[in-house]
């Protein structure tokens, strides 16, 4: 594309992809970073609007993180144990393993079902309507959980409740998805106040740590009632939320895409909006030309929805990309996230750790800080470097947890297990926990991105269904009672994910979607993407060869 002066915005040429521009883009596009609808207001008001808008955008994933650890947190509350558990000889109550398994497995089971229902709806009607529908359904789920007096009613409530960025900045902003989840997990563990005051307004009420100081049903009601905050925020801000510009471009609604971009960037950035729309159109057209179109007569439609996209994801041209995206997300579950994160408080309680709520608060704080650190590192270090080697380190930590679980004196060994869990959590959140979302979100071709993300969500939920159902049977005293030995199980599954990642994970940092299409179409080995990309840009980085590198020379 020819470079013209009208493509320069704040001294940056947006018609090209250059990693050296990412920090200047980030500085000049503050509105995109903390999106808001307000256009011209005094500076203090604009700042407040941007903060609140940024929090509003992340509300959905904060709610996901909040809900992911709700089962383990509630199971550790005495009032909840008394309401739904069975008495044990020492006079306390214990939640049976099959209750915990069913409660925690129902959400991913419903997530799998909703994925196949919602994915074609989102592709046809856009992303914005889905936010409103999900918020209304979430309210119904919270009501069922709050009013439940039987474990089956609580089960029903748990079940119900269960792409515009520049290439230079994709990793930075996609990492915020994971940080929002981690904040929700942290918020589920600590009462609002102090330096988390702003986020506490989002989370609204005191949660597990604060409610543990109460007695009676409000001890477990308070965390559940706090869930009303999230759909309330989403419904309130929904009228102001713009539709996805990328989706609008794919639908041929260019003028609406420009309007949506103006609302995101601000009216003073008309030039940038035009450049970005052209970039999205070019990527969309190039993706279609490289991957090819299936004849309309060969496509099948169900209720007006294209049913071939999911099958096409596993076709010859897309199979590797689909499996890479699935493994990048599912690898989180395989490496032990469900065990270490989802049941942290309950597991620490079973290990007889004193002040186990405080210990879990510290754990989620470590995870939050590590996830924040992943923001710049994903663009400075790259995706592959931040995932592949750390996955093998995580496997070693799981193996060590398993070994400590075999020590006869478990009261002493428990502190070693806790230390390993903390180290595991830090490495996980700074690596695959944050960057896995980045890779899974950007690896698919633009035309099949929605279908691929649906498959990623369904597969990840399937792993969640399996592990959420089985982990309580592994650790509960009335079942497997494995303790730290459960680390051996996740060491095995994690090693599979680590080895698969070594061969499948490419370096996608700063690579436009169209170039990714070319690299995959050429048959280039994913682990050599960076070298080939640098060769494409005229940068020689292969010291072992005296001739230029061609993509076909790097096929695995």
Swiss-Prot record:
Places the protein is found: Membrane
Gene transcribed to yield this protein: ecdC
Organism: Aspergillus rugulosus (Emericella rugulosa)
Any one GO molecular function term: carbohydrate:proton symporter activity
Entry similarity comment: Belongs to the major facilitator superfamily. Sugar transporter (TC 2.A.1.1) family.
Protein name: Major facilitator-type transporter ecdC
Gene3D superfamilies (alphabetical): MFS general substrate transporter like domains
Keyword annotations: Membrane, Transmembrane, Transmembrane helix, Transport
Domain of life: Eukaryota
Keyword presence, Transmembrane helix: yes
Residue stretches spanning the membrane: 51-71, 102-122, 129-149, 169-188, 195-214, 220-241, 333-353, 361-381, 387-407, 417-437, 455-475, 486-506
InterPro entries named among the record's database cross-references: MFS_dom, MFS_sugar_transport-like, MFS_Sugar_Transporters, MFS_trans_sf
Keyword Hydrolase: no
Listed SUPFAM superfamilies: MFS general substrate transporter
GO cellular component: membrane
Membrane topology listed for this record: Multi-pass membrane protein
């Amino acid at each position: 594309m020819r470079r013209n002066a009208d493509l320069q915005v704040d001294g940056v040429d947006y018609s090209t992809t250059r990693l050296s521009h990412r920090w200047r883009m980030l500085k000049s596009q503050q509105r995109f970073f903390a999106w808001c609808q307000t256009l011209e207001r005094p500076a203090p008001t604009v700042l407040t609007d941007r903060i609140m808008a940024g929090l509003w955008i992340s509300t959905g994933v904060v709610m996901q993180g909040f809900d992911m650890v709700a089962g383990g947190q509630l199971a550790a509350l005495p009032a909840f144990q008394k309401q739904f558990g069975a008495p044990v000889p020492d006079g306390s109550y214990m939640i049976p393993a099959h209750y915990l398994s069913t409660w925690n497995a129902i959400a991913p089971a419903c997530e799998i079902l909703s994925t196949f229902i919602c994915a074609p709806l989102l592709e046809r009607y856009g992303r914005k309507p889905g936010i409103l529908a999900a918020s209304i359904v979430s309210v119904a789920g919270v009501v069922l959980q709050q009013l439940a007096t039987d474990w089956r009613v609580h089960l029903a409530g748990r079940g119900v409740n269960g792409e515009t960025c520049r290439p230079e900045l994709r990793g930075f902003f996609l990492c915020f998805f994971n940080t929002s989840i981690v904040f929700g997990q942290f918020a589920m563990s600590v009462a609002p106040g102090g330096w988390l005051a702003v986020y506490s307004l989002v989370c609204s009420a005191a949660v597990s740590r604060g409610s543990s100081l109460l007695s009676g049903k409000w001890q477990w009601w308070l965390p559940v009632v706090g869930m009303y905050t999230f759909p309330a925020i989403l419904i309130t801000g929904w009228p102001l939320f713009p539709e996805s510009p990328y989706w609008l471009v794919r639908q041929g609604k260019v003028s609406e895409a420009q309007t949506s971009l103006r609302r995101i960037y601000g009216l003073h950035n008309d030039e940038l909006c035009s450049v970005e729309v052209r970039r999205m159109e070019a990527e969309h057209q190039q993706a279609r030309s490289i991957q090819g179109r299936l004849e309309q007569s060969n496509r099948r439609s169900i209720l007006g929805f294209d049913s071939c996209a999911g099958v096409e994801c596993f076709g010859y041209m897309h199979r590797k990309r689909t499996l890479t995206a699935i493994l990048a997300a599912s690898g989180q579950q395989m490496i032990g996230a469900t065990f270490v994160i989802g049941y942290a408080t309950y597991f620490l309680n079973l290990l007889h750790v004193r002040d186990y709520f405080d210990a879990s608060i510290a754990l989620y704080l470590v995870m939050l800080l590590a996830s924040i650190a992943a923001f710049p590192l994903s663009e400075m270090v790259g995706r592959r470097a931040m995932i592949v080697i750390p996955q093998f380190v995580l496997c070693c930590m799981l193996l060590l947890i398993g070994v400590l679980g075999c020590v006869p004196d478990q009261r002493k060994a428990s502190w070693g297990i806790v230390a390993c869990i903390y180290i595991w959590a830090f490495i996980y959140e700074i690596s695959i926990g944050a960057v896995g979302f980045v890779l899974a979100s950007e690896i698919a071709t633009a035309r099949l991105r929605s279908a691929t993300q649906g498959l990623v969500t369904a597969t990840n939920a399937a792993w969640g269904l399996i592990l959420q159902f089985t982990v309580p049977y592994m650790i509960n005293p009335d079942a497997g009672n494995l303790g730290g030995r459960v680390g051996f199980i996740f060491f095995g599954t994690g090693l599979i994910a680590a080895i698969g990642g070594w061969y499948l994970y490419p370096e996608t940092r700063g690579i436009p979607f169209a170039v990714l299409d070319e690299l995959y179409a050429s048959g280039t080995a994913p682990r050599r993407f960076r070298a080939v990309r640098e060769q494409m840009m005229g940068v020689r980085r292969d010291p072992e060869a005296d001739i230029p590198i061609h993509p076909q020379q790097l096929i695995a």
